[in-house]
Amino acid sequence: MPLLLAIALAVFVPLSQPGAQGVPAAEAKASALPAEIPLFPLPETSLFPGTSRPFQIYEPRYREMIADALKDNKIIGIVLLRPGFEKDYEGRPPIYGIGCAGVIEKYQLLPDGRYLILLRGLTTFRIVGEDQRKPYRLARVEAVAELLKDEERVTLSALRNQIEKLLYAVLPFGADPPDPSLDDDEFVNIVAQNLDMAESDRQDLLERNSLVARARALVERLERR
């Protein structure tokens, strides 16, 4: 099974064409996750802290969500839809309780009303409630901190080295591994986001209670390939 170590979304259009707008760096930094954020539930796409991902927004309710977010703090939450979501997709289908908040770094509003956005992961969150005052979903959330103690950073660095070696062993010919200059945190999350696996397995990685636990799970997964 091939590894997806570069983001490849069928809906992606590069945000380098005329009309793309960047969000100023000062606005793109969130010192704390808001108590309430809009949710963007998706069937086959996850986001991890420190990673970037492009999206095309075409449903009217989510166009409104992006327009509102751009007027506010630029933050939305990516959550994975649970199996069976098709029965109530137009309403409020079942979702997982842990997601990742992201800030809109770049966006482009197309003539037909669609948005192209580049989203940068900020932090994982836990949903503690929902509000139904908007056409899109709003959730009350709590941030799930991924802070590391000094001794845990040593462990994470060792696990990152294991992951790098295992990736080199299974990468298809011509594929590029992640940038070796990345911080350990970012490296682990980029591999977790882009390694080819079922989305339910990726959700399991997202829900790990620490970066060390996530890295250990990645090592175990790569060793089974």
What kind of region is each of these model predictions?
Residues 2-14:
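Bacterial N-terminal signal peptides
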Residues 21-225:
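N-terminal low-complexity, acidic/polar interaction/targeting segments
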